[in-house]
Every structure is written in structure tokens, then in C-alpha cells.
């Protein structure tokens, strides 16, 4: 989930003789990590972009997207598989998490924290544990929404 997908953090390319490919540029604002506001998990952000809006008008395209999502939700995007992947990435990071916070931990100083949403709530993450909770909660909520929107019908 990347609120600026299709606008800032994605690009389209095509190899000679190949199909159009969509790729992510970065995920710095993905998974509810945007500094200035909470990213809702229950909307399709890409349809706000004219490219995707036009694609989404094509019934065949929609059917293919929904079918592919149903397939992936049973394997790669299954809750259990996602949890295992996150756990394996955490294990791989190991002590690097502590080293990162030794170098960059000052960025959590309350005098430096600037991200608040429109209700005045802090958008700044204060710990690795809080960041992981936000990430896993956001992914779980997002997958449930997408199943309802794309795969459960």
C-alpha cells in the first residue's frame, strides 16, 4: 500500500518487444509510513491516477486483477506466509536493528519530531517495535480490505 503509487513512487517501462511493466521506485511512504497523515487501508489509491483509472474501466482487466489476487491470497499473500516473511526479515536484520538505532536513534528526540496528522496526533514512530506493529497491522488490514474488494466476490 503506497498512497503515492502511480503518482510519485512507481514507473512504467517496456523492454523492446516486451510488455509494459509497472515497478516501484520506493516505499518510503508505503504501509502507513507517510509523515503527515494516516494512510487508510480501505481504499484503492491507484484509481485516483488517470492511468489506473482508465485501466480499471476495462472489465477484462478488472477480472484478471481479481482472479490473480484470489490466487495470490492463497499463497504469497496468505496471512501466514506474510507473517513468516516478516519474521524471516526480522531474523535477517538481527543486530543491525540495534546498530541502526545507535546511529539514528537521536531522530526520535521529541524536539525533532515533526509529523502530526490533521487531528494533532503524532505520526512519528518511536521504536522498532512500534514500527513493526504499525507495519504488520497495516498489512493485515490492507489484505483483508483487498480480499473484500477484489477477491471475496
Mark where each language-model region is.
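Middle-to-C-terminal accessory/interaction subdomains
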Residues: 1-153
Amino acid at each position: 500500500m503506497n498512497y503515492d503509487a502511480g503518482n510519485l513512487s512507481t514507473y512504467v517501462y517496456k523492454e523492446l518487444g516486451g510488455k509494459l511493466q509497472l515497478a516501484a521506485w520506493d516505499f518510503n511512504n508505503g504501509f502507513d509510513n507517510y509523515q503527515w497523515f494516516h494512510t487508510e487501508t480501505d481504499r484503492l489509491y491507484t484509481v485516483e491516477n488517470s492511468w489506473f483509472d482508465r485501466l480499471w474501466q476495462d472489465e477484462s482487466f478488472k477480472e484478471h486483477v481479481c482472479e490473480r489476487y484470489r490466487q495470490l491470497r492463497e499463497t504469497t499473500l496468505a496471512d501466514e506466509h506474510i507473517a513468516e516473511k516478516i519474521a524471516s526479515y526480522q531474523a535477517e536484520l538481527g543486530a543491525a536493528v540495534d546498530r541502526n538505532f545507535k546511529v539514528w536513534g537521536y531522530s526520535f528526540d521529541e524536539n525533532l519530531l515533526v509529523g502530526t496528522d490533521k487531528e494533532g496526533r503524532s505520526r512519528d514512530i518511536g521504536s522498532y517495535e512500534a514500527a513493526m506493529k504499525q507495519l504488520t497491522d497495516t498489512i493485515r488490514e490492507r489484505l483483508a480490505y483487498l480480499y473484500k474488494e477484489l477477491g471475496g466476490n
